[in-house]
UniProtKB/Swiss-Prot annotation:
GO terms for cellular component: nucleoplasm. The lineage of its organism: Eukaryota, Metazoa, Chordata, Craniata, Vertebrata. SUPFAM superfamilies: Winged helix' DNA-binding domain. The keyword Protease does not apply. This is Forkhead box protein D3. One of its GO terms (biological process) is cell differentiation. Pfam families: Forkhead (PF00250). Disulfide bonds: none annotated. Residues 77-99 have a biased composition (Gly residues).
């Protein structure tokens, strides 16, 4: 009885304690807290968290966002992984496409690399172009056109080597420039080969030259030298390039045939436009009244008699420095024979070729040419009477 009473008392205390404490009842048929209505075990996540284990404020929202993000497929998830694999496949396809494009580009560049530069020098290329032309001469543009058509390597690299062709044409003596004819319009001069440079290649092979060809003297310098030497009279004709090319040497007189090889001809030195005076005016305006008639008679007699005049002693005393001073020995001194070589020879030649025009000019300058010679010889000209007596006018 006591035990039962005590037991009833304890059951009553237990019932009071159960009523005083709030118990969260999940369901009526729950026999155990860890099982649901079907008797299955609950997951620990479905149980509510105790108050002391509750998270900080805002943590459920973050957890909900994480769960929602976990449910949605993305690039980093397995579904996304499969997509990434597809992307990788696309990358592989792109890589394969890029490799095909690179192979195609390599195939296109392969013909360019297969073009090998010809083993000929620029001089050999220019020589080929000139020799194949019908006229054996070409302009710079014609030479470049031949090289481009003949060799594909130079066709693709055309602008780069044109200056090299121009420099080789100008700097090598084996190429000669020919000016363009007046009736042949166009641009640029012609270029041809020097005739002496035909054997500069070994056995006609353009791969190797024997030696560098050098011209001894350029043709235009020879022509200029010939023109310059012709202005020096007979001595210019005796030079190594004194006569133009194409004329025989006998066309010009030898300087030894001249009477005075050390005196050039006076004819070209005389002024052609010398004023000509009438004979009467010339006699009045002579340097000396007594010398005017004598010079005229002497020139007229020299034109018929010869080129050398031999003078004889006259009855009158000779004109000399001793006669002016008054010495007696000068009056009795015999006069020597005098030959008037240079002045009279020049005068006689001029009178024979141009009797009218140059005779007056020579008469005007004859005292200047003859007086110094006669003074040195010690005798002056003879009087007119002695000249007429010895050589009468014919």
């Amino acid at each position: 009885m006591t035990l039962s009473g005590g037991g009833s008392d304890m059951s009553g205390q237990t019932a009071l304690a159960a009523e005083d404490v709030d118990i969260d009842v999940v369901g009526e048929g729950d026999d155990a807290p860890g099982k649901d209505g079907d008797g299955e075990a609950r997951s620990p996540a479905a149980l509510p968290l105790p108050l002391d284990e509750a998270a900080e404020p805002g943590e459920p929202e973050r957890a909900a966002r994480r769960a929602a993000a976990a449910r949605q497929p993305g690039p980093g998830r397995p579904e996304g992984g499969r997509g990434g694999g597809g992307g990788g496949g696309g990358g592989e396809e792109g890589a394969s496409g890029g490799g095909a494009a690179a192979a195609a580009a390599a195939g296109q560049s392969k013909p360019k690399s297969s073009l090998v530069k010809p083993p000929y020098s620029y001089i050999a290329l220019i020589t080929m172009a000139i020799l194949q032309s019908p006229q054996k001469k070409l302009t710079l543009s014609g030479i470049c056109e031949f090289i481009s058509n003949r060799f594909p390597y130079y066709r693709e690299k055309f602008p780069a080597w044109q200056n090299s062709i121009r420099h080789n044409l100008s700097l090598n003596d084996c190429f000669v420039k020919i000016p363009r004819e007046p009736g042949n319009p166009g641009k640029g001069n012609y270029w041809t080969l020097d005739p002496q440079s035909e054997d500069m290649f070994d056995n006609g092979s353009f791969l190797r030259r024997r030696k560098r060809f050098k011209r001894h003297q350029q043709e235009h310098l020879r022509d200029q030298t010939a023109l310059m030497m012709q202005g020096f009279g007979a001595y210019g004709l005796a030079g190594p390039y004194g006569r133009p090319y194409g004329l025989p040497p006998g066309a010009y007189p030898h300087p030894a045939a001249l009477q005075y090889p050390y005196i050039p001809p006076v004819g070209p030195m005389l002024p052609p436009a010398c004023p000509l005076l009438p004979s009467g005016e010339l006699s009045r305006k002579a340097f000396n009244a007594q010398l005017g008639p004598s010079l005229q008679l002497q020139l007229s007699s020299l034109g018929a008699a010869g080129s050398i005049v031999k003078s004889e002693p006259s009855s009158r005393p000779s004109f000399s420095i001793e006669n002016i001073i008054g010495g007696p020995a000068a009056s009795s001194a015999p006069s020597a024979q005098t030959f008037l070589r240079p002045p009279v020879t020049v005068q006689s030649g001029l009178v024979a070729h141009q009797p009218l025009a140059l005779a007056r000019t020579t008469a005007a300058i004859a005292p200047i040419l003859s007086v110094p010679t006669n003074i040195i010889a010690g005798q002056f000209l003879q009087p007119p009477a002695a000249v007429q007596a010895k050589w009468p006018a014919q």
